[in-house]
Amino acid sequence: MKKSITTLDLNLLLCLQLLMQERSVTKAAKRMNVTPSAVSKSLAKLRAWFDDPLFVNSPLGLSPTPLMVSMEQNLAEWMQMSNLLLDKPHHQTPRGLKFELAAESPLMMIMLNALSKRIYQRYPQATIKLRNWDYDSLDAITRGEVDIGFSGRESHPRSRELLSSLPLAIDYEVLFSDVPCVWLRKDHPALHETWNLDTFLRYPHISICWEQSDTWALDNVLQELGRERTIAMSLPEFEQSLFMAAQPDNLLLATAPRYCQYYNQLHQLPLVALPLPFDESQQKKLEVPFTLLWHKRNSHNPKIVWLRETIKHLYASMA
């Protein structure tokens, strides 16, 4: 017999969604500000109501049953609609609203001041938390710890960072595409040489450790040509590579996105940018689509929709 929703405590559905996100009774309890015992009791009630285990224990935490997997999208949509309904009376000035962002630097630093002003104009009591994009950021979006991410992906067919490789639960929108440049100080000796692949490879390079990898599409293209660059230094962020490349008497070359020109102008670094010495087909493999990323469950969340549109508008005004 079909059960009526009137026989179910709807608070249990929130517990169910958090269990699906966290795959842990303890972590779900922490987010609900209750004890793990209370979450376990709620899970027992849900199992009885759905007549299904819903989750089973595994070495990686709670593993959802086929029924739970089939309900995930419907549950997320139901929660979105509930949030929309509850948001109505407070849509203009909600208290305690938090914006959790993950972005690579200096991508967010370029517009952080303008974005924060927009947020505080609309939500005066909001708080903003910005973290650097790293190997765990996609999982953080899935876990609900990050509202929206802003990061570059890759276009090389052999890359692990293709847009097509994103998890199915992640939605995205490409804001702009960029091709990296070579950044070197204004008095670098390479500027007095013919700029070609041999010159590019003659000098030591700064590499960015990206999502736990020291190599990226640039190294794939060089490998296809039977060439290799000398990586003398690995750093976690683009702005650090620009800072080091700008140091006096430094022979290091930094390869970073073209948008860093804006960052370079803001901080008046003594750097010039040269194109990577590749043909058009090779340049195409190095194209970086800079992308907003969010979880599908937040596709209609008013806060996330507003944030996406605000970031899009800010970058359009800089183009």
Curated annotation (Swiss-Prot):
Function, in words: Involved in anaerobic NO protection.
Membrane-traversing stretches: none
Family classification: Belongs to the LysR transcriptional regulatory family.
A molecular function GO annotation: DNA-binding transcription factor activity
Disulfide bonds: none
The gene coding this protein: yidZ
Annotated organism of origin: Escherichia coli O17:K52:H18 (strain UMN026 / ExPEC)
Protein name as annotated: HTH-type transcriptional regulator YidZ
Domain HTH lysR-type: 8-65
